[in-house]
Amino acid sequence: MNWAPATCWALLLAAAFLCDSGAAKGGRGGARGSARGGVRGGARGASRVRVRPAQRYGAPGSSLRVAAAGAAAGAAAGAAAGLAAGSGWRRAAGPGERGLEDEEDGVPGGNGTGPGIYSYRAWTSGAGPTRGPRLCLVLGGALGALGLLRP
């Protein structure tokens, strides 16, 4: 099991659970109906009774449900990627590795460009390795230290 994506998904679920607000207002913002004073709103200055509609989108736990659905979709995508990797699909070459596209330069009839001036990394500034997994591991370590993540 690849722990970096699992840690990221656990962090997403923990953040959705901890940041879920029961006082979140559902639906579209702003006054609607008689509170706006439109044609159907009755006379101006008349006492109005504000009827609060049932919460739909901002109900407690809805962001947790969305995060759980996202985690399930991510798990399904990860499982599909794992199955695809095991069934003959090739993995993309990482930084510093030579892939199949790099090897076609050396064969007779290759284009001869090589990984030098024509490479994407030569033309982009600061194209070093990404630091995403490090952040994920730090956050996963923090969750593990807090006892929220159990391997």
From Swiss-Prot:
Keywords: Amyloid, Cell membrane, Glycoprotein, GPI-anchor, Lipoprotein, Membrane, Prion, Signal. It comes from the Eukaryota. Mainly expressed in brain. In brain, it is expressed in hippocampus. Glycans are attached at N111. The keyword Cell membrane applies. It holds the Pfam family Shadoo. A lipid is attached at G126 (GPI-anchor amidated glycine). N-glycosylated. Residues 1-24 form the signal peptide. One of its GO terms (biological process) is protein import into nucleus. Residues 127-151 form a propeptide. It is a lipid-anchor; GPI-anchor. GO terms for cellular component: cytosol; extracellular region; nucleolus; nucleus; plasma membrane; side of membrane; vesicle. 'Shadoo' means 'shadow' in Japanese. Belongs to the SPRN family. Prion-like protein that has PrP(C)-like neuroprotective activity. May act as a modulator for the biological actions of normal and abnormal PrP. This is Shadow of prion protein. It comes from Homo sapiens. The lineage of its organism: Eukaryota, Metazoa, Chordata, Craniata, Vertebrata. The gene is SPRN.
